[in-house]
Every structure is written in C-alpha cells, then in structure tokens.
C-alpha cells in the first residue's frame, strides 16, 4: 500500500474544510486505492458544486488531465465542467466502485458502475489514474463495450 504524503492525522473532511474555508492545499494522507474510490464518491457523485470544487482541488494536480472516449479536458475547471455535463446528461445517476482499487508505482485503477441508484450497472468501466506528488495528475476513463459504448451517444461534448 502506497501512502500519499500529507499532514499526519488529517481526514478527507478536514482537508475539504480547509480548502473551502482557508484555501489551504496539501497532498492527501490516504492510500491511493482509497483516493480512487473517493474520486467516484466525492467528485463524480457530488452534486454540490462548492464541495465538488474543494474535493477536486484536494485530490487533483492543478494542471491535471482527464480523458475518456468522448473528450479530454485539462485543469480543475475542466474536470469540474466535465462532471457538470455528466450530471446534466444523466440526472439521478450515481457511481459505485466495483470492488477495490489497485495501485502501485503511482498508477491506480478502479472499476465502477454507473446508473440509477436501483440499477447502478447500466454503464460500467474502469478509471486509470496517474498520481504525482500525492495528487491525480491524469485520469483515463474506459467504458466497457468499446470506445464510448452507448454512453458516447448520450454524453454531450464540451464547447
């Protein structure tokens, strides 16, 4: 298990609070696999824009990169806007991790399910993340069933 350097004894909620209240930003003190799950639950499931923005700043490098079969975006605002588009295209859908994430040497992957809460496996896939200095530097999303699968037709592109 790789531990990301940060403030000893910090928890995710306190880090989010520090970012919201004081603008502080430090690397997380959690194992990378736990951050992969938190990425789904605290960022991609979060409907509150302020909390999501704080979580993005807590978990992603400022110059991060995100790519799926539909588009690629850069930076915190790019990730934030991508999640907004996902929520607009699929109201009420949620992500759930499918089993534990695995990680080594700054690379991690997390299988997931996405859909209505009562049928959360409507769309499945895997996130692959590259970590640098304790933050997600790049996140690549692969949707089961081929490039973009059926989601590509329903997930609007940016700009």
Q: Where is each model-derived feature located?
A:
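A beta-strand edge to alpha-helix "cap/lid" segment located at domain peripheries
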Residues: 19-31, 87-159
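A solvent-exposed, acidic/Ser-Thr-rich amphipathic alpha-helical stretch
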Residues: 50-106
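Hydrophobic alpha-helical context, especially transmembrane and signal-peptide helices
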Residues: 1-2, 66
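Residues that form generic nucleotide/phosphate-binding pockets
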Residues: 39, 43, 82, 86, ...
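Short, low-complexity N-terminal intrinsically disordered segments enriched in polar/charged residues
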Residues: 13-62
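Acidic, Ala/Val/Gly-enriched low-complexity intrinsically disordered segments
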Residues: 2, 6-18
């Amino acid at each position: 298990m790789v531990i990301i350097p940060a403030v000893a004894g910090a928890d995710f909620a306190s880090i989010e609070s520090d970012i919201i209240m004081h603008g502080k930003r430090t690397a997380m003190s959690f194992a990378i696999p736990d951050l992969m799950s938190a990425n789904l639950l605290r960022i991609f499931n979060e409907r509150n824009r302020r909390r999501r923005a704080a979580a993005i700043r807590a978990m992603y490098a400022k110059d991060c990169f995100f790519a799926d079969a539909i588009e690629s975006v850069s930076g915190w605002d790019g990730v934030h806007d991508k999640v907004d588009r996902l929520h607009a295209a699929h109201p009420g859908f949620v992500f759930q991790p499918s089993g534990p994430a695995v990680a080594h040497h700054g690379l991690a992957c997390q299988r997931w399910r996405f859909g209505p809460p009562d049928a959360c496996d409507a769309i499945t896939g895997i996130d692959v993340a590259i970590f640098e200095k304790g933050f997600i530097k790049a996140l690549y999303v692969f949707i089961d069933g081929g490039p973009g699968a059926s989601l590509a037709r329903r997930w609007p592109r940016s700009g």
